């Protein structure tokens, strides 16, 4: 299986929208749903000792949108989701995704959670801050939440890219979060090779075969109705 | 569990879009995906003797859109989908759903399949012609495909409503297709009580709890990551 560089990841994304005519609504729904399924599979079993209260940290772009979708589906799967979503856009889709969360009883807050509150309250953190278009360094307004993620002992599930990591080179000196689980979407990016002791899943079962071939992705087979594949 | 009348079904749908601010893209993707999952579960096992070539009949409205989405996901699950989609709209979403199918190698045709071809070629028919807003009688342009569905021995999976049935009263004298499987979306409609010897599934795992309560739906519990529940 191929690990995409940043340029390839951006190109694949553009082709899905421009050539294959998917809407952001469609693919974000499928991506966020696959994240919720991985989380439910990994941490949601009745035997799991992980608390079902989940902090979902959503960034300003599409990675954050995946997080908002995941939060909604997690709520329907009896997780207690709390969303931190500090920097919002005026795009209808994002306003509506937030509204959908709130009308299902999910709090969507601009207040950065403290380390103490996170450690005391949550069983899991979903990191949906930055995705494959991120370039370091992290902007100052996100420094407080990155500090919480860096210091917290609560397991982190990163959506597509561990936030703050370079998409190709991985952890940076100042941003070195270590997710317990990474959910690569569409295809893994190069930084996923720098994971240590993390579960790694692939989600986003929507890539047209012709596009897989064009980028020589060699994706693994999704079994049955699964929306994800466990890679390691 | 409650079976909705036509007025309730229309109201629930309107609330999902107007109050909960879902887009058609989002809910159609989830609905169509749940249909593909039911079909894969029911007919897609390696032990199944049903041929994996599926005729997906898509009507002019949202029921047809669910069919187009299901066809695309079925293709990704190694079913060989062929779409009959005679009456198309100018809406971007539908143009794009058709394009997505075609760019995955699915033929989308306006030519009504003959009974002989259907019987010889296909292992399954997905009936996504008319949904919960249908009122009999069937328009003349759909008479040929309804005739095929009425006469064919190939198992039919109906999406939300067996096409041609009255949403509340069920089979009509002139339209009395007998699906092998019905996938009710969101909540079953009254006509589902008139099924005989059919499998019955519920899909569309996206109904906000407050909306479920408002309509006293008393939906069954979706287990694990399943996007459907088997009702009978």
Swiss-Prot record, chains A, B:
One of its GO terms (molecular function) is nucleotide binding. Its cofactor is K(+). Binds 1 potassium ion per subunit. It catalyses: (6R)-NADHX = (6S)-NADHX; (6R)-NADPHX = (6S)-NADPHX. (6S)-NADPHX binds at residues 62-66, 131-137, 160. The keyword NAD applies. K(+) binds at residues 63, 127, 163. Residues 9-219 form the YjeF N-terminal domain. Its EC number is 5.1.99.6. GO terms for cellular component: mitochondrion. Gene3D superfamilies: YjeF N-terminal domain. Keywords: Isomerase, Metal-binding, NAD, NADP, Nucleotide-binding, Potassium. Catalyzes the epimerization of the S- and R-forms of NAD(P)HX, a damaged form of NAD(P)H that is a result of enzymatic or heat-dependent hydration. This is a prerequisite for the S-specific NAD(P)H-hydrate dehydratase to allow the repair of both epimers of NAD(P)HX. Belongs to the NnrE/AIBP family. This is NAD(P)H-hydrate epimerase. It comes from Aedes aegypti.
